[in-house]
A protein has these predicted regions:
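Basic helix-turn-helix/winged-helix DNA-binding cores
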Residues: 2-112
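Intrinsically disordered, low-complexity, charge-dense segments enriched in Lys/Arg
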Residues: 107-181
Length: 181
């Protein structure tokens, strides 16, 4: 019987390299000016494209409108979205592969009651990058938290980031095996 081992040569190594090189945009790297919906989708698709190469329109205006209707993000002001809304949408786009929209709203509510939004967002970015490193490289998940103070809330962020990384790992390797649609 032939083994179903993925090709660990070029394709798998490229994939691993892409995941290890991925860097989340930090809060201060997001546009400081307000953006229209089409500019938001362009920015989000740009930020997320390294995680899902070749996937067109990872984020659409209809999705954004849905998140506003479900009160996961605040509605735009004069049809424009600010930096915080963009950061929230970025997190939603990552977390929606693992959690329901209701769960994402709850996660964000808990974090913003505990930490200023900018700090909570940047912490999620750091933890996601660490989770990608551990998941796609070392498989060592014992690295200490990057939180200045470990709390149940910071561990919730850390677990969420690990969930996203594990989902990406599973998705990517199923593709390499040729078993995912």
């Amino acid at each position: 019987m032939e083994s179903m081992t993925p090709k660990m040569s070029g394709e798998a190594l490229d994939l691993i390299g892409q995941m290890l090189a991925y860097r989340c945009p930090r809060y201060d790297q997001l546009p400081a000016i307000t953006l229209y919906s089409d500019q938001v989708t362009d920015a989000l698709n740009y930020y997320l494209s390294p995680l899902w190469p070749g996937a067109e329109h990872t984020v659409t205006a209809a999705m954004i409108n849905n998140y506003v209707k479900q009160k996961v993000i605040a509605p735009p002001v004069k049809k424009r979205y600010d930096r915080e809304q963009l950061a929230r949408l970025y997190c939603i786009c990552l977390l929606k592969h693992v959690f329901t929209i209701s769960e994402i709203r709850d996660l964000m509510t808990i974090q913003t009651k505990t930490y200023p939004f900018e700090k909570a967002y940047d912490y999620f970015c750091v933890e996601l990058e660490k989770a990608l490193q551990a998941t796609f490289s070392t498989r060592d998940f014992s690295a200490p938290s990057s939180a200045s103070r470990v709390t149940p809330e910071s561990e919730l962020v850390r677990s969420s980031a690990l969930s996203v990384a594990h989902r990406l790992f599973t998705e990517k390797f199923l593709q390499l095996y040729g078993l995912e649609d």
